[in-house]
């Protein structure tokens, strides 16, 4: 089952197909597993800093190895999936990411940590472009925003559980054995992905209806030239803010007197709020539009970070779910807008480019904010994070104007044809 097969229409009338539901569930499961693997690293960073005497900049570099490689391999993974098949690529990438955790558990030096993180980034690069394009192809048309919102929401489900479980395992059996256990979970997930997608019968599992040339279509040229770059820029800033904040949140909590169990609980609370934010903001984006939702989420993110800095540990923990709602809520709006800006035949590449930009920004931002933290301190660096996220607000306003102009032209075209 390849992306090409899933994205190619057949001209048949669309009808309910259990294959669509299976594709969505497998994509959601893969997203939850991979995001759980990725975000468990936040819990390990303070332990590595203590064991290997690392600076904030070095911590940022280690984090960037994983996310940077993951960003760089997004487009190649999507292209390779067209040859090998989506099932094999998703399962194989998951297995590689799991093996990386097994290697993390056996690492005795920073060099081995770096090798394991690079390997994990390669494995995790397969998930986003392949799963997103499969879901968008399976739920073509207006339903794609809701389906992609569900897929995006699923990524936070594992985040709500894995940090707390990992923190408990570290306290009981050490971080090395915990890494091994997480790797075994990943291998089991890889097998489940392969078996589940094999049950979907090749190209007949998902059918994308062909639109006739007479169907009303927006001005794709204008959307690609003007709208998609704006959306990508908003996504880059949003991702850089999220990854920068999450990377240094454990260190901020440490400075407030938090121990490892409290840090694990804090991450779980952020991710729980993030899951709720993705679900709620997906509905808000569909009802209110891009601009009001981005104004709400990004403004609340900046305000939440500013409020968090002076609070004691108890009040900080209570605030974190609210920050999580705002921190992750924007992404549901952004992911769901990609199909509105890109024609179906270019969607796989667009998702690859979008994820390359956003994940790449998430990889680079911890390094830059780490350098700032070493130079000016942790609190001023987090103040900078809060300031930069506000740059998304004028960009969202411009994107809304592009979308409104295209919608106006489409309505005018329809009115002329009626007359």
What residue spans do the PLM features occupy?
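Cytoplasmic helix-loop-helix junction between adjacent transmembrane helices
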Residues: 116-154
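A late C-terminal transmembrane helix in Major Facilitator Superfamily
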Residues: 345-375
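Helix-loop-helix hairpin linking two adjacent transmembrane segments in secondary transporters
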Residues: 151-199
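Extracytoplasmic gate region of multi-pass secondary transporters
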Residues: 41-42, 227-275
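Residue-level signature of mid-helix packing/kink "hotspots" within the transmembrane helices
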Residues: 39, 67-75, 160, 271-279, ...
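Structural signature of the two symmetry-related core transmembrane helices
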Residues: 88-102, 292-306
């Amino acid at each position: 089952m390849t992306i090409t097969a899933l994205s190619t229409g057949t001209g048949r009338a669309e009808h309910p197909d259990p294959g669509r539901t299976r594709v969505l569930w497998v994509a959601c499961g893969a997203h939850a597993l991979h995001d759980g693997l990725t975000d468990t690293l936040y819990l390990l960073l303070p332990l590595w800093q203590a064991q290997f005497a690392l600076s904030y900049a070095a911590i940022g570099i280690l984090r960037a190895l994983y996310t940077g490689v993951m960003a760089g391999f997004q487009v190649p993974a999507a292209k390779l999936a067209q040859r090998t098949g989506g099932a094999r690529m998703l399962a194989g990438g998951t297995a590689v990411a799991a093996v990386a955790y097994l290697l993390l558990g056996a690492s005795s030096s920073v060099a081995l940590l770096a090798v394991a993180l690079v390997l994990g980034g390669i494995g995790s690069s397969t998930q986003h472009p392949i799963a997103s394009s499969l879901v968008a192809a399976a739920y073509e048309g207006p339903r794609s925003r809701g389906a992609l919102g569900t897929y995006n929401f699923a990524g936070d489900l594992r985040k709500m559980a894995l940090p707390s479980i990992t923190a408990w395992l570290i306290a009981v059996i050490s971080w090395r054995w915990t890494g091994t256990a997480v790797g075994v979970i990943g291998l089991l997930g890889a097998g489940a992905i392969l078996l589940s997608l094999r049950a979907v019968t090749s190209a007949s599992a998902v059918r994308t209806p062909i639109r006739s040339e007479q169907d009303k279509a927006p001005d794709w040229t204008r959307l690609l030239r003007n709208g998609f770059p704006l959306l990508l820029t908003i996504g880059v800033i949003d991702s850089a803010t999220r990854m920068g904040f999450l990377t240094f949140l454990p260190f901020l909590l440490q400075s407030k007197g938090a121990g490892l169990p409290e840090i694990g609980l804090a991450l779980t609370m952020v991710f729980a709020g993030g899951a709720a934010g993705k679900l709620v903001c997906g509905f808000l984006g569909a009802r209110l539009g891009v601009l009001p939702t981005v104004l709400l989420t990004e403004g609340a993110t900046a305000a939440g970070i500013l409020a968090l800095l002076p609070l004691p540990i108890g009040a900080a923990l209570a605030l974190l779910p609210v920050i999580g709602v705002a921190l992750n809520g924007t992404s549901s709006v952004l992911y769901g807008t990609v199909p509105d800006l890109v024609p179906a035949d270019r969607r796989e590449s667009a998702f690859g480019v979008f994820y390359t930009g956003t994940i790449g920004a998430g990889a680079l931002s911890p390094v830059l904010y780490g350098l700032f933290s070493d130079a000016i301190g942790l609190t001023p660096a987090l103040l900078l994070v809060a300031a930069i996220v506000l740059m998304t607000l004028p960009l969202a306003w411009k994107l809304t104007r592009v979308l409104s102009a295209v919608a106006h032209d489409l309505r005018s075209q329809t009115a002329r044809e009626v007359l």
